[in-house]
UniProtKB/Swiss-Prot annotation:
SUPFAM superfamilies: WD40 repeat-like. Belongs to the WD repeat CIA1 family. SMART domains: WD40. Keywords: Repeat, WD repeat. WD repeats lie at residues 12-51, 57-96, 101-140, 146-185, 192-231, 250-289, 301-335. GO terms for biological process: iron-sulfur cluster assembly; protein maturation. Gene3D superfamilies: YVTN repeat-like/Quinoprotein amine dehydrogenase. This is Probable cytosolic iron-sulfur protein assembly protein Ciao1. InterPro entries: CIAO1/Cia1, G-protein_beta_WD-40_rep, WD40/YVTN_repeat-like_dom_sf, WD40_repeat_CS, WD40_repeat_dom_sf, WD40_rpt. The keyword GTP-binding does not apply.
Amino acid sequence: MGRLILEHTLQGHKGRIWGVAWHPKGNVFASCGEDKAIRIWSLTGSTWSTKTILSDGHKRTIREIRWSPCGQYLASASFDATTAIWSKSSGEFECNATLEGHENEVKSVSWSRSGGLLATCSRDKSVWIWEVAGDDEFECAAVLNSHTQDVKRVVWHPTKEVLASASYDNTIKMYAEDPVDNDWDCTATLTSHTSTIWGIDFDADGERLVSCSDDTTIKIWKAYHPGNSAGVATPDQQTVWKCVCTLSGQHSRAIYDVSWCKLTGLIATACGDDGIRIFKETSDSKPDEPTFEQLTAEEGAHDQDVNSVQWNPVVAGQLISCSDDGTIKIWKVTE
């Protein structure tokens, strides 16, 4: 059995902490929460501490933050229906742009691999795609209304300009730009969960996706491209996503976040039962029928709901979590 070892417990925010995000270099992270503030933390020696507090960008709770792939920009999604773009061009972090258009709370934000596109989603049931036009200018490239309910999460594919979204309508949608008319279209709808899907994440090459839900299950989805060796039909020459594995029985309440480590292949979950669990693909796993086992679990990882987990993109086995209990924790996973 593996172990989840607590390395640091950090405090500073007032109220619940909704989101944490590692900088691409892995030596800095950002956090956000109910106090309408973003904190930038960095490691000095063996101590993590807040270096910057950004408190003038939003009027309500900040739900999620994400660094751009280049690490120069930070995007924050807020319940005030805006997304703010921050950069450190002058040595100090400044809010360079505020993206408006959503009618209700913005729940999630994600940068494409190139950094040229930004996606946001909202309680207004829409997904917006923004083009980075340079000089802190962002232009709306698409408004996608494929979901019938609140959209909880958006995540870009790690290598392609393909976007995934997860919703209160129990579905995941995939989007891509049509090469003929340059319009963004919904190319696939993934159905299997029986309740709200809170989190999604791609594996390292983007051929699989993990999802977590209010139905207390985790599901693994696999992409089947036109001409695939498994003989899965691909109507209209579009990639088909099939649910190839369901993990159930490990979580007693809603699973709010899931992170698939690009370095180790481990999957971490954040749960409403205050726990963090780590899953590993088994050695006899098959491509079209993968199997996963629980490597380790920390049942009382936090004192209240765990809202977010994210693997460090550089330091293998390092995991960060945040909670309604107002703490951030950094963990080391050993196999």
